[in-house]
Amino acid sequence: MAAEEKDPLSYFAAYGSSSSSDSESSDEEKETENAKNRAAKRPFPTEAKKLPGPDELFRSVSRPAFLYNPLNKQIDWESRVKRAPEEPAKEFKIWKTNAVPPPESYQVAEKKAPPPELDMAIKWSNVYQDNGDDAPHANQAKCLPEEEAQEDSPPSDDEQEKAFATKKRKV
């Protein structure tokens, strides 16, 4: 039996030898038969310990040793439970966003009115320094002709004196 249980790699070592082909075929047949017999006799290696079967295991062990309490025969599962620490309630913080606020909280920012600008004709005239007689000038707009404007407004004392002085000069 010791001859049969030689090194399992010897099969491959004999395969590469340079002996005659007849002896190789007979050696190969013997090796394959021996390998089949060995496989049928030992399905698992004998060197490793076998695990006990389920029936045998449950007959010998009823519960783990760390749970055994000789004073109380029942297992206190509540004392074994591990709970996560409770987190404190989170405070609500308003997120800072660039989003448009809802309509009820939206207040239109009042913008200042743009400064009164010059007429573009006057502005361009100043840019190009076109200050001739026909250049536009910034004067008060006149809606009524001069004659009607004088009739509507009562003449002041200064205007009456000037008008009287001009009449005297003309004569």
From Swiss-Prot:
Biased composition (Acidic residues): 146-160
Disulfide bonds: none
Stretches for region Disordered: 1-56, 126-171
Bias (Basic and acidic residues): 47-56
Pfam families assigned: DUF4660 (PF15559)
Family designation: Belongs to the UPF0690 family.
Protein name in UniProt: UPF0690 protein C1orf52 homolog A
